[in-house]
């Protein structure tokens, strides 16, 4: 995606920093130095400073605050800040106890942060520099003297170093603890596409990934990974490949940290910025499950979110931190997990993190009610005939799904067709099962239950209410007549429509499913003629193309979009199927 609301990189970076200060009044932005700092810092504690190119937010700036980073210096997007900027940041939060500078293992970062560090040392001040290197995708042979790249493990080093400094530990101890964390880190990423940097030309088409292609190990600045994969593997297969690179001790090129099943491990899942939280959350769970199943690793802490992004990158990363060993410093032992658990006041760090992931729900789960199975009809129907009629209807609906989806994408959110298809597939599965009965009331009520289980959103609720009302109408009618006929079904449909109207303001003329449903029901009640009722439903659906929508997301569509309502088309597909 090469479209942005703000295309000036300098405006982006500086205003992004100012936003953090807007939210946290203990933070101040140094505009000339382009860094943000915690102005209430304790001058007797070690100051912890980090930074790097912009575009990786919340790293580094959102982790500035009490108990974490003292300052973070920002370069332009994907470019290291200058040594002058960094040195100004160091002087801004100078401490009696000294300064620990943390950067990621990239040449530009090391040179600029290192130059600033040497200036501070020349001035007679205590200062140390550590570079986070946690990427496993580029092995020892390829990385050579440069070493591993720095990825999302950097955030855990920020947290641990900041917590150690907040305890008042000396610079040597804080540095030793932070280095111990780096030595136990492994990370890897996977991406579906390169990212576009605001203000830059789009990536050349010949360099862009194809639709059925992804890159394993792609860096956070669009750098190449270890390989491109086509076709894109299943998520389970992809996770297996990623964990193998992280944990396979037989791969001497990448076996940086030995992690075994009985180790204490922290898992950090990183969203590169462009994955929906729904998809990212599902991926995170799959990683946790794969660790347990394939490696017997059960993390003691799990973090998931956008920690070190690549602008709006379509990808994710996995970071594992081995925390089994206590770090020994001057006769004292320190737990990395305890330091991670230590409270902070930094905007980017998760506030809600339970200290014991092994805690389980002890009260048990309530069961989902199956419905009233004690209601019975005084009559039965030809089971196979009804079954086939329903099958015809649902298959016709499934066949119509692409058309429904097309029109709903033009005038809505595009999910009407797929939602109806899910419901149809659920009904088909039910009617072909042993649970399908010859009791007409139970058939209708069970279909209502199936709809509840398989169709979400507004349309699912509307159809479920309609069919529950249908079952009630059938029950009331059969209690009086004890005879099953087209009039019985018509009476049930009339009650179903009345029931639906209790819960929706939609009426004919509003460009909704009601424009097809109401004429169908009214015609069938009046004539008991199915074909005539279906024809009226078609006319009602066709008419919606010229209506102004008054309900649903279609309300926001421009008047020039003339398409029939997708919900009305769905009704037509259902009732039309009964005539086949």
Swiss-Prot record:
Substrate binds at residues 53-56, 104, 109. It comes from the Eukaryota. Its EC number is 2.7.1.28, 2.7.1.29. The keyword ATP-binding applies. Keywords: ATP-binding, Glycerol metabolism, Kinase, Nucleotide-binding, Transferase. ATP binds at residues 413-416, 458-459, 512-513, 565-567. It catalyses: dihydroxyacetone + ATP = dihydroxyacetone phosphate + ADP + H(+); D-glyceraldehyde + ATP = D-glyceraldehyde 3-phosphate + ADP + H(+). It holds the Pfam family Dak1. It is an enzyme of class 2 (transferase). Residues 384-580 form the DhaL domain. GO terms for biological process: glycerol catabolic process; glycerol metabolic process. One of its GO terms (cellular component) is cytoplasm. GO terms for molecular function: ATP binding; glycerone kinase activity; triokinase activity. SUPFAM superfamilies: DAK1/DegV-like (SSF82549), DhaL-like (SSF101473). InterPro entries: DhaK_ATP, DhaK_dom, DhaL_dom, DhaL_dom_sf, Dihydroxyacetone_Kinase. The active site is at residue 221. Pathway: Polyol metabolism; glycerol fermentation; glycerone phosphate from glycerol (oxidative route): step 2/2. The keyword ATP-binding applies. Residues 8-349 form the DhaK domain. Belongs to the dihydroxyacetone kinase (DAK) family. Homodimer. Catalyzes both the phosphorylation of dihydroxyacetone and of glyceraldehyde. This is Dihydroxyacetone kinase 1. It comes from Schizosaccharomyces pombe (strain 972 / ATCC 24843) (Fission yeast). The lineage of its organism: Eukaryota, Fungi, Dikarya, Ascomycota, Taphrinomycotina.
